[in-house]
Amino acid sequence: MLQISHLYADYGGKPALEDINLTLESGELLVVLGPSGCGKTTLLNLIAGFVPYQHGSIQLAGKRIEGPGAERGVVFQNEGLLPWRNVQDNVAFGLQLAGIEKMQRLEIAHQMLKKVGLEGAEKRYIWQLSGGQRQRVGIARALAANPQLLLLDEPFGALDAFTRDQMQTLLLKLWQETGKQVLLITHDIEEAVFMATELVLLSSGPGRVLERLPLNFARRFVAGESSRSIKSDPQFIAMREYVLSRVFEQREAFS
């Protein structure tokens, strides 16, 4: 379980997050949404251990987070892939740094690529891939170390609408298959409502938790209902419009 208690953090010398209290249980998909500048990415960077926080605590499985660790896998919008390495070697890179034997890490990379639908693309280079394929590689790399927690920072923001829909459904299938804790940062309201088992709305900066909404649309999808059916459901549309109104309230307050 991820547990965040009374978290305060600065960014660029200014308060970015204020008294954040959150929990994320195993098998849950928590989505954090809010207006630009609300501290969404700062929150992810704190959980990843990339930056320090000023007050409070972040614990994963009862252990305080004070730096990066293999128990947390991170996927970024810009993927962060190595262009001079092929797809398989990119996925296996973290395992190589961890000292995993070559044949074992290549087999793990092969299995992860199979999970994300890129079996057969092992020897291709990053520049030969589409945006959606590069994000699949990024997800495969994050899963390769078998982390307890998967962190994703607006991973589908630069993709076209069709590819974004494909990646959303892929992530939900991987979430169901692996049972991992997942925390997703997004600025896309429809994506947030569709994918969250719990949606956290942050205020304008410094970010505070405005509201926590338990949702069941992601579970309906993994139970077999189509994404198109879910997104055209009046319940989904009503929730999307409610969340949109809450985000607009914060944008207007900030301006």
Curated annotation (Swiss-Prot):
Family recorded in the similarity comment: Belongs to the ABC transporter superfamily. Taurine importer (TC 3.A.1.17.1) family.
Top-rank taxon: Bacteria
Main location: membrane
Entry-linked NCBIfam families: PRK11248.1
Binding site for ATP: 34-41
Protein name (record): Taurine import ATP-binding protein TauB
Lineage: Bacteria, Pseudomonadati, Pseudomonadota, Gammaproteobacteria, Enterobacterales
Enzyme class: translocase
Encoding gene (name): tauB
The organism of origin for this protein: Escherichia coli (strain K12)
Stored InterPro entries: AAA+_ATPase (IPR003593), ABC_transporter-like_ATP-bd (IPR003439), ABC_transporter-like_CS (IPR017871), ABC_transporter_ATP-bind (IPR050166), P-loop_NTPase (IPR027417)
GO terms assigned for molecular function: ABC-type taurine transporter transporter activity; ATP binding; ATP hydrolysis activity
Membrane topology, as annotated: Peripheral membrane protein
Entry's Gene Ontology cellular component terms: ATP-binding cassette (ABC) transporter complex, substrate-binding subunit-containing; membrane
Any coiled-coil regions, as ranges: none
Pfam families membership: ABC_tran (PF00005)
